[in-house]
Regions:
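Bacterial Sec-dependent N-terminal signal peptides
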Residues: 3, 22-46, 195, 228, ...
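An aromatic- and glycine-enriched ligand-binding surface/loop that stacks and positions planar moieties
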Residues: 27-94, 200-201, 217-371, 492-495
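Conserved, well-structured interaction surfaces
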Residues: 46-55, 59-65, 90-168, 182-190, ...
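Flexible, polar/acidic helix-loop-strand segments at domain edges
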Residues: 95, 99-105, 329-413
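Long, intrinsically disordered, low-complexity segments
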Residues: 121-124, 194, 260-320, 326, ...
Length: 550
């Protein structure tokens, strides 16, 4: 999606249209009230009105993105990994909930799961199925117009089912309004089959590009890219590779020269994005993550960790020696040696930001350090010595005037497709092809890291892991990657994250390696699959809870 006022207006009108046309009883997924009314005749006799109805599905891109609330109640799932630390220890807010889940994962249950997508997901699927059924019954449009409407709707149905599948594996499948109160889950294979079918249909119908008035819509490239992503999760390696190949064959997208440009709206590698306006829709990402000094008593809810910083290679592709900073020293950390993606992702002590030099130190004026648990809430302060830079809007300088954020959310971009194909080729035994795609990402003109060569087996997998961690940092992938690789229970148990406590010292600064958790983190193997919500179990006699959650 690219900027377009027509689409923006359409989305907002569509939210009212949905209430009028399709959401009678929207709190009850099994509501089967007939909708053969005047509203159906109005919708399906006017393509503009039907399109507004369809536009109500586009905000799902926002809901499940890093600026939305449907993944983890507005938290970044990176807070469940070694790469990000939330600053509060009080459950019930964005910062504290994440810490609660990594320290006491037993908190997750069928009656309380902040990562749950079941109820909201099925509500959205019902809306899509109702749209499709209503279209088939009442549409007066041409076959081509109907096909384009159906392709977009089925794209979003696959998109929502993917959110369920990556949490639960096999789920209850509904493709029409023939709803059953008691229905069992389908298998994981059947669930992935439906997702693939919807996306392949979308790819077969959607245009490579829309006209200017519709340029924000999902395209053939978005359908192929989403298919590549979902088939990677399904471990259908050939299907993932083939879908990725189809994206490249379109010859529409190219990597941006500069890494930081890949997150701006309308850039050359953006395949699917969602745009915002001050007047709405908008988001609050800056309010949550800007550094101390940007706004009063807010921001800095979560920050990159020392573990993440040390994951970055040097500009010449080598591992940087951080041993001097695993104690106390007044020597400046080697930030200037790190590859370009570091400075585009992390606001470090000494970085330039909005005309200021960051001072992420105790008592700092632009950026300020606080010990974890020294206060209930960070209020803009960092507990790691770092702040997030990626996604923040450097032009947003006065929060007293504009309190909301409008930077674009890029859901799918070409670098991810390179890395999907790299992993698929690795799984298929094509090590050389996998390395070519990893190197394509590493060697974009503005970065130009040395090419990797001669890697195979586990060494190649480590390189792919490294690139996904760095290239896709804070884009919502790492936690889910570690789950699908079944590595979370091995690497995310009995560990703590760290930071650098920076203190003014004799006209300079002292850097002290500190424990930012003060207790071990845990990952329970049973959380590889999330529990079915209690309400579903209570109202559906055909479904059983997973053995791990009984």
């Amino acid at each position: 999606m690219k900027n377009g006022e027509i689409m923006k207006t359409g989305i907002k009108i569509a939210m009212m249209s949905l209430l009028t046309f399709s959401l009678v009883g929207c709190n009850d997924f099994l509501d089967t009230t007939p909708h053969d009314s005047i509203s159906d005749k109005v919708v399906w006799n006017d393509i503009h009105t039907a399109t507004l109805y369809l536009n109500g599905f586009y905000p799902y891109i926002d809901r499940y993105g890093q600026f939305g609330s449907a993944q983890f109640q507005g938290n970044l799932t990176e807070g469940l990994t070694e790469t990000f630390k939330y600053g509060s220890y009080v459950p019930g807010n964005k910062a504290g909930d994440s810490n609660n889940y990594v320290f006491t994962p037993e908190t997750m249950s069928s009656t309380g799961n902040l990562l749950d997508a079941w109820t909201g997901g099925y509500e959205r699927i019902r809306r899509i199925n109702e749209f499709l059924e209503s279209m088939r019954k009442h549409s007066t449009f041409s076959a081509e117009e109907n096909a384009k409407l159906e392709a977009q709707a089925r794209f979003f149905r696959a998109f929502v089912y993917f959110q369920l599948a990556k949490r639960h594996g096999g789920v209850i499948l509904y493709t029409d309004m023939n709803l059953q109160k008691n229905k069992d889950r389908s298998s994981a294979s059947e669930t992935w089959d439906l997702i693939a079918s919807d996306l392949k249909y979308a790819a077969s119908v959607l245009p490579v590009r829309w006209d200017a008035a519709n340029k924000e819509r999902v395209t053939r490239g978005a359908a192929w890219a989403m298919l590549a992503r979902t088939m990677l999760y399904a471990e259908r390696w050939q299907d993932a590779k083939d879908a990725a190949d189809s994206v490249f064959k379109l010859q529409v997208y190219s990597l941006t020269d500069k890494y930081e440009d890949a997150f701006k709206g309308g850039n050359s590698e953006s395949i699917l994005e969602y745009n915002y306006l001050v007047t709405g829709p908008n988001h609050t990402f800056d309010n949550d993550y800007v550094p101390y000094g940007d706004m009063d008593n807010d921001g800095g809810k979560g920050c990159p960790t020392q573990e993440m910083v040390e994951s970055y290679q040097s500009k010449d592709g080598k591992t940087v020696d951080w041993s001097k900073w695993h104690g106390e020293t007044t020597e400046l950390p080697p930030y200037d040696q790190l590859e370009p993606r570091f400075a585009a992702t992390v606001l470090y002590h000494g970085a330039q930001w909005k005309g200021h030099t960051m001072t992420n130190s105790v008592g700092g004026t632009y950026g300020q350090y606080m010990d974890y648990r020294s206060d209930t809430y960070p209020k803009g302060r960092t507990t790691t010595g770092y702040y997030l830079r990626k996604y923040l809007d450097e032009s947003h300088t006065d929060f007293s005037v504009i309190k909301v954020s409008t930077q674009t959310w890029v859901e799918l971009r070409l670098a991810e497709i390179y890395l999907i194909r790299a992993e698929a080729n690795y799984r298929l035994g094509a090590s050389g092809a996998a390395l070519e795609d990893v190197n394509a990402v590493r060697q974009r003109p503005g970065m130009n890291l040395p090419a990797l060569s001669g890697l195979s087996g586990n060494d190649l997998f480590k390189a792919i892991r490294q690139e996904r961690k760095i290239e896709l940092a804070y884009e919502g992938h790492l936690y889910w990657d570690m789950r699908r690789w079944k590595l979370a229970d091995k690497e995310y148990n009995g560990y703590r994250v760290h930071g650098l406590k920076i203190t003014p010292h004799q006209g300079a600064f002292k850097f002290e390696y500190v424990d930012c958790d003060l207790q071990d983190r845990k990952f329970l193997a049973k959380t590889y699959v999330f529990p079915i919500p209690y309400d579903e179990l209570a109202n559906n006699s055909a479904i059983e809870q997973y053995d791990e959650w009984k």
